[in-house]
Design a protein with these regions (language model features):
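Feature responds to low-complexity, polar/acidic, surface-exposed segments characteristic
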Residues: 1-59, 66-87, 95-101
Length: 101
């Protein structure tokens, strides 16, 4: 079962993500990947997550939360080191970059 999940999610992600992009392993990496591919837009508010020290990751997390692409864990925490299963990467990517019908 696990082997099938790994194969299927990797195939999907290799098709979805930009060429050469690593599959994000945590929430911070996923926020950065989405934000970078969206053109690094400025968030509406100053980054508010106390647990995100890196300036770019803080902007990415804030912007993703503002856009409803990713959820904050609380009003002031994002949990950037939190593990992100591959199916969540697929869901988040599809939410950020929906395919035209």
């Amino acid at each position: 079962m696990w082997g099938g999940y790994e194969v299927v999610t990797r195939v999907i992600l290799n098709e979805l993500l930009p060429e050469g992009a690593a599959i994000p392993a945590n929430r911070g990496q996923l926020a950065l990947l989405v934000w970078n591919n969206a053109g690094r837009p400025e968030p509406a508010a100053q980054p508010a997550f106390a647990d995100v020290a890196d300036a770019d990751m803080a902007k990415a997390a804030q912007w993703c939360a503002e856009q409803g692409i990713m959820e904050a864990k609380s009003t002031d925490t994002f949990k950037p080191e939190g593990w992100t299963p591959k199916f969540n990467v697929i869901e988040t990517w599809n939410k950020a970059f929906p395919k035209a019908a």
